[in-house]
Amino acid sequence: MRKIYFVCLMVLGLSANATIQDYDLYIVSDSLNLIDNSKLPYKVFTNSASFQGKNVIYNINEGDTLRLNVHNTDSDIHHFQVKGMAYPATIIPANDSVIVEMVFPDAGSYIYYDPLNYPDNKSMGLAGMINVKDHSYSSFYWNIKDFQKSKSLNIDAGNVEVWNDYYPNYFTINSKSNPAINADTDARVTGSVGDTIYIYMVNTGQSIHSMHYHGYHLEIMHSSHEPSHVGRIKDTFPLYPMETLVLRLIPDKPGEYPVHDHNLVAVTANMVYPNGMFITLLIAD
């Protein structure tokens, strides 16, 4: 095991309540069960050595240190990196582990991923989210992905993939599609009229997704792609590959309202509608 410290230098003004959050993280390979009962070769970052369908979602506070003991249970070398953090990728040999340590001084959402042979390993599933909070409001988390099944099978077979002809045919939030996604308590937005609700979104796929909210307008609190858009209030939010958004919702009426990708092919699973990127908000009086 190697121990590697990466400390962000922008530490002025960090909270006196900042803590060190320490976790084990495992790279595990298996298959993802898709909504049409087919399987997709898949790799994930999990919190145990057993396969779990979705990547771990980390939630920490502004100024906290995140210390991860990353175990590679796979037979291949993998890398670990957090997009936007100023340090190189960490190499993790097969059946070995490393410790990485990072300080997060700024609130927002960050993507951790495997950049090796980019985007192959990331497209096989190895990309998750780290959410850095400056509030204590109810929060929900969406890790958005898209897959072209034939490419996943080709990479899994050890072949070289070409990405200039990418046509994804499966689309997930937290590794689930409609209707299964509504059973995911991390993703399914619930609350009451007048609540303050935060929605953290990362796009770890290869396509742009334009997420459209019915029923409400939301405020942009963080945008990695367009920081100047913070404060804008609207109902549709483009989310570019490997970029992040944090939105704030204060519901003004009760009801159940859909959220879906405006690129309607992403609301399908292998062209079956609406088995893709479609979820509902459930707001009580």
Language-model segment annotations:
Residues I197-M211:
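Long, repeat-rich segments with strong aromatic
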Residues L218-F237:
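Intrinsic, low-complexity N-terminal interaction/targeting segments
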Residues I4-L14:
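Sec-dependent N-terminal signal peptides
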Residues A18-P88, I99, V132, I155-Y198, ...:
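N-terminal, post-signal-peptide metal-ligating segments of extracellular/periplasmic oxidoreductases
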Residues V28, V202, H212-H214, H262:
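Generic beta-strand/beta-sheet core signal
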Residues Q81-A86, I208-E219:
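Short acidic, flexible loop segments centered on an aromatic residue
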Residues S75-H78, Y87-S150, F237-D285:
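Extracellular/periplasmic metallocenter environments
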